[in-house]
Structures are given as C-alpha cells and as structure tokens.
Amino acid sequence: METTQHEVETQSEQGQPGAEAEKPTDWKRVVLDILETLVLAVVLYFGINAISVRVRVDGYSMTPTLQNGEYILVNKLAYKMGEPQRGDIVVFVFPIDPHEDLIKRVIGLPGEKVSVHDGKVMINDVPLDEPYIAAAPLYNGDWVVPDGQLFVLGDNRNESKDSHQWLYLPMENVVGKAVLIYWPPPEWQVINHTKEVYAGQ
C-alpha cells in the first residue's frame, strides 16, 4: 500500500495521468464537506429547537423592557431543574386561551400575598423596588398565590393583560424563560432578570 501511494504521488508531480485521477477525489472531498456542513446545520437546528423557542413580542405590555416587534429567544429547559423566581420574564400559555402565548414578569410566588396599593406592589406587605416598570399601577388589589401557581404582571402595568385581571398562572403553563433579544440587530442583548429587591434595601 505504501508503494502504491508513493507511485501516485510521484506520477502527480510528474504530470502523469495520476494528476487527473486526483480530481474526482477533490470533488468527493468538496461534496463530503458540504454534506457534513448540512448535517451539522440540521443537528444544530433541531438541537436548538429542542431546548429553546423563538417568539415575537406582540404589543406593549412589557415596555420598556421589551418592545413591540422584537424577537426573543426562550430557554425551555430553564425550569426543568428548578422553579421560576421573582423577577423572571417568562413565556407561557395563556390560561384563558390555550391558543395564545403571553410574556410577563413573575411577581408573586406560591403562598405569597401580593398587594397593589397607592402605586406600589408589595409582597407580604413589603414593597418591591421596581425600576423596570413604565409607570406606577393605577389599580389596587390583594391576592394570595395558590400552591403550584404564579402571579405575573407586565412591566407596562396599566396596559397589560395579566394576573391582576385573570388571576393566577399555573406553573405547568410556563413555556420557558426569556433570555435574549436577537432581533432587530441593534437591540441585540441578553435579557437582564431583575434580582429580588425590596424597597429600602
């Protein structure tokens, strides 16, 4: 085998027929490279779709954090090993209409009392510091979040269809956690999920 390889290489260098015989091999390599690239692209496509979903923001209920028309990447595995935390921005199946997906911020966790009074949101009577909202809420109310459910609000408090209207979000309805704004390109950024901060801290 070594002798044959040496002969082919020598013939190629000398411009013998072996040089022409090398062309099909080059084409095979090109085709093989293309096939490998296509296979890798398909694997990556299905792999990414298995762990994430891409959604379009439709409306203004999450301004100023998210803008109408932006596209975001949602991590579907975020809550397989844990549960949503206060401040997380989540995409979920609307409990009232299973054909509709919504995106809101988690405010109340199971067992907590959520109160909205005088433009402030409070958890167990302790006000939250919310620098991300568009304006203080104009509505008032008190809610106690049941086990296995969440209380979610839009950052644009007075223009949002959320838990202050239709009550609680079952955890099983959560699709995933919003992690990245990827379109349009000038708005590309990792979504910053506000840590739990109480007013006065």
Name every feature range the model reports, one short phrase each:
Residues 1-201:
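Extended hydrophobic leader/signal-anchor segments used for secretion and membrane insertion
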